[in-house]
Amino acid sequence: MDPKKIARINELAKKKKTEGLTAEEKVEQAKLREEYIEGYRRSVRHHIEGIKIVDEDGNDVTPEKLRQVQREKGLHGRSLDDPNS
């Protein structure tokens, strides 16, 4: 997210505590917060999708739901053509 938008979120939060927000500022704040949260969710999702879990013996124990997402995206050598990957 653009640093200017984050600064604006913080500015609106500070103003809300000190003097309150106008109706337009409340709408702007809600929109900016939603944009920030969506970006955060995308980042976390991307990070989790890149994880491969192995046990002490080196066996892949990644949950099947995550494996399916990785197959669809071709991550960690997984392929839709090979259901065992």
Swiss-Prot record:
Keyword Secreted appears in the UniProt entry: no
Subcellular location: Cytoplasm
Protein name: UPF0291 protein SGO_0570
Source superkingdom: Bacteria
UniProt KW keywords: Cytoplasm
Record's GO cellular component terms: cytoplasm
The organism's taxonomic lineage, starting at the top: Bacteria, Bacillati, Bacillota, Bacilli, Lactobacillales
Ranges of Basic and acidic residues composition bias in the record: 62-85
